[in-house]
Amino acid sequence: MEMWQADTFDPVTIDRELGWAEEIGMNCMRVYLHHLVWETDKEGFKKRINEYLTIADKHHISTIFVFLDDCWNPVYQAGKQPEPQPGVHNSGWARDPGDLYYKGDTAVILPVLESYVKDILITFKDDKRIVLWDLYNEPGGSGGYRYGERSLPLLQKIFTWGRTVNPSQPLSAGVWDMSLTNLNKFQLENSDVITYHTYEGVNSHQQLIDTLKQYGRPMICTEYMACLLYTSDAADERSSV
């Protein structure tokens, strides 16, 4: 949330880092939003999104925006964020909506989420600087706060909200865990562009590509490579030893 809140939005740093991205040839950036920033400062949030898009466009970088997310910290708050924990990966990353939905009052949070998603989509539905809307990152989650197939109803709802607005950009939600059968089925049947995550080696990655090709739609790998998992040619060699 620090990226988007008024007190910590930092266009100078964004400009510098997107400049580095441009220098190494990146032409698309995947960027996470959060409903709580919208809820506390709707118009300011949208102005900052537009400012980000202007900076990215200056560096010839298009944007994929992400709405919901089942990864990392399930509890969060607006305002000053916790300090990073040294040595802890993504220690400050906040889910959206997290426990506010999965352990809270869905009758309260659902209308907020619907208004948020529709407002952002309506505002930017014809913005050519946005190449795709990634509606839900890794639905089902992982680790000690895994929601599993319980994420399916919310996934279905956000696709319904997206189709109601019908933006000019494609809608998608990336598959990432083949054990989540019902989630995967819905994601693959309803995504305009097939997006996916893999942290496996080259051979396994190619097998996944071959499997997803059957849907006959464009494909984008929106997350890959992890040094600790040896995501290279050598990874497949290690796994066969």
Where are these regions (language model features)?
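Active-site mouth of glycoside hydrolases
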Residues: 1-193, 197-206, 214-217, 228
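The feature captures the conserved acid-bearing segment of alpha/beta-hydrolase catalytic domains
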Residues: 211
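Conserved small/polar residues in nucleotide/adenosyl-binding loops
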Residues: 230-237
